[in-house]
C-alpha cells in the first residue's frame, strides 16, 4: 500500500488548459483594436509568446500586501504581453488591450478542464488522500478554479506570488508541505514540466510524476514515472 498521504498538482497544463491557444486569444482581442489577422502574424505571435514567457523572471515579488501582490502580478504579465507585441508589432491603445486580455484570463472562459480531471480528483479524495496545488500561476488561479468547479476539491493552494518562491525552488514545495503538516516522504507532486515539477519536487524531497498528455509512448527517462492521463495516477500511487 502506498505511504503517500498528500498529492500535489501543477495547475495549467496538468489539470486544465487554454481553450485554443494563447496566441489566437491575444490576436482575437487585438483585432478589436485594429490589428489585422494574417496567418503569418498568428505564427509570429505563437513564437513570440513562447520566447517572452521563457525570458520572463520568476513571478516572485518582494511585497506582502495582497493588493500590492496583485499589482505586481499584473505588471509581470504586462511586461510579458508587451514583450510579445514588441516582437511582432506594437499598436495603439495597448494598455486598454492588455487590461482586456488580463481580465479575460482571470475567469474560466478561456480555460477548459481535461476530461479526466474532476473524476480522478474526486476519486482520490474518496480514497482519503489530501490534495493540493503548487503552481507558478498568479492569484487569478483561485477564480479560475472556482469557475471550473474544482476549487473545493483541494485542501490547499500554493502559488508563487504568495509563497515568495517559484517552482522549481524547493521553498515553495516545503511551504505547501507545511500547510499539511507532512514530511516530503508523505507526498508526491504531479506536473507537466520536467524542470519545474519533477526536478523541483525531487530537490525538495518529494516524489514526482510527470504527466505528458501529448505523448503516446511515454518518457525516455526511465527514472521518471510518466503518465499520459490522470486516470493512470491511482495505479501508479500504489507502487510508490
Predicted segments with their positions:
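Asp-based, Mg2+/Mn2+-dependent phosphohydrolase catalytic module
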Residues: 1-7, 17, 36, 40-43, ...
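N-terminal helical cap/lid subdomain that shapes the substrate entry/recognition surface
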Residues: 2-119, 126-127
Amino acid at each position: 500500500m502506498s505511504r503517500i498521504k498528500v498529492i500535489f498538482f501543477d495547475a495549467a497544463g496538468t489539470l486544465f488548459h487554454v481553450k485554443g491557444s494563447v496566441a489566437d486569444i491575444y490576436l482575437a482581442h487585438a483585432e478589436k483594436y485594429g490589428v489585422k489577422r494574417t496567418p503569418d502574424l498568428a505564427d509570429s505571435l505563437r513564437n513570440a509568446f513562447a520566447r517572452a514567457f521563457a525570458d520572463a523572471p520568476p513571478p516572485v515579488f518582494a511585497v506582502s500586501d495582497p493588493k500590492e501582490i496583485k499589482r505586481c502580478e499584473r505588471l509581470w504579465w504586462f511586461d510579458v504581453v508587451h514583450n510579445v507585441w514588441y516582437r511582432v508589432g506594437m499598436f495603439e491603445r495597448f494598455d486598454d488591450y492588455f487590461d482586456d486580455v488580463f481580465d479575460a484570463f482571470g475567469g474560466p472562459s478561456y480555460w477548459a478542464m481535461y476530461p479526466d480531471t474532476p473524476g480522478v480528483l474526486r476519486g482520490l479524495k474518496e480514497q482519503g488522500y489530501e490534495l493540493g496545488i503548487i503552481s507558478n500561476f498568479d492569484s487569478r488561479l483561485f477564480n479560475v478554479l472556482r469557475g471550473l468547479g474544482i476549487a473545493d476539491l483541494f485542501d490547499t493552494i500554493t502559488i508563487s506570488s504568495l509563497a515568495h518562491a517559484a517552482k522549481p525552488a524547493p521553498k515553495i514545495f516545503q511551504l505547501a508541505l507545511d500547510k499539511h503538516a507532512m514530511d516530503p516522504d508523505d507526498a508526491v507532486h504531479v506536473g507537466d514540466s520536467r524542470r519545474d515539477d519533477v526536478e523541483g519536487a525531487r530537490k525538495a524531497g518529494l516524489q514526482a510524476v510527470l504527466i505528458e498528455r501529448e505523448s503516446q509512448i511515454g518518457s525516455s527517462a526511465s527514472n521518471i514515472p510518466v503518465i499520459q492521463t490522470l486516470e493512470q495516477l491511482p495505479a501508479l500511487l500504489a507502487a510508490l
